[in-house]
Amino acid sequence: MSITGMDSSHVTESQGTLLFNEPLAEYTTWRVGGPAARLYKPANIDDLALFLSRLPFDEPLLWLGLGSNSLIRDGGFSGTVILTQGCLKEMTLLSDNCIRVEAGVSCASMARFSARNNLSGGEFWAGIPGTMGGALRMNAGCHGGETWQSVIEVQTINRRGEIRTRKPEEFEVAYRHVAGLGDEWFISAKLQLSPGNKETSLQLIKDLLAHRAKTQPTNEYNCGSVFRNPPGDFAARLIESCGLKGVSIGGAVVSEKHANFIINHQGTATAANIEALIHLVQTKVREQTSIELIREVHIIGDANVQTR
């Protein structure tokens, strides 16, 4: 079938929801971005596999969870977006202190689920504003914890809808980076934690969230950390040392609370404002420190606004 002529009749056997020309701003934590040509909300993993198997092999695909760590440009995305958040949301307690979690589960939910089941080592997920699929994709972490330190195995799916089970040794895992995925996406993982105490873990989560609220602009639209920390230093320290706190382009502002955050002030920024500010910060830091800040955030889509 031709994706350009795709309509709901093409997915009559699917159980999910297919939307057309769907604005993406509401699906991202920055609250910016143009529309997706198509957006699919799968009912479950089997439904996702069926949907993918019927797409043209060259169809552009974008996977979104909570939409953190992503900047969708104002022109939107001309392919199909797969939305996992609120869809692939199963968590199952297994034996041997293990949990099976699907990609659409929020990291915060995973932290609470593990704590309430007397497992420790996953409290740090409460501080990650994304889904477990995204956490697996970039080895997300904070407060001394990283996602892949707990991975026993993962399930991936390719654009033909074929599902594989893979082991950690098949990937190259580093700081905020996972290589070896190829043209596949994470759909679930088996994670092993340590025996713990529910009350202790829940208190750790409470303390972590309080610290996050105190040190990060959690009451403003943001994507999380914009840049990776360079070896032996912190991106926020470098940005602040260059006098960039509070610098703005349009409604995009370098946070006064944490310099490695760019906020969409009162929802007035465009994606173009944010992207321009990212480049400005990189340029100023490079000029003043000779250090190249590497983006943690992914920039996606068409910069030009389309007339539809």
Curated annotation (Swiss-Prot):
EC code: 1.3.1.98
Keyword Flavoprotein: yes
Ranges where the FAD-binding PCMH-type domain occurs: 32-196
Keywords assigned by UniProt, alphabetized: Cell cycle, Cell division, Cell shape, Cell wall biogenesis/degradation, Cytoplasm, FAD, Flavoprotein, NADP, Oxidoreductase, Peptidoglycan synthesis
BP terms from Gene Ontology: cell division; cell wall organization; peptidoglycan biosynthetic process; regulation of cell shape
Function: Cell wall formation.
Protein name (record): UDP-N-acetylenolpyruvoylglucosamine reductase
Origin species: Legionella pneumophila subsp. pneumophila (strain Philadelphia 1 / ATCC 33152 / DSM 7513)
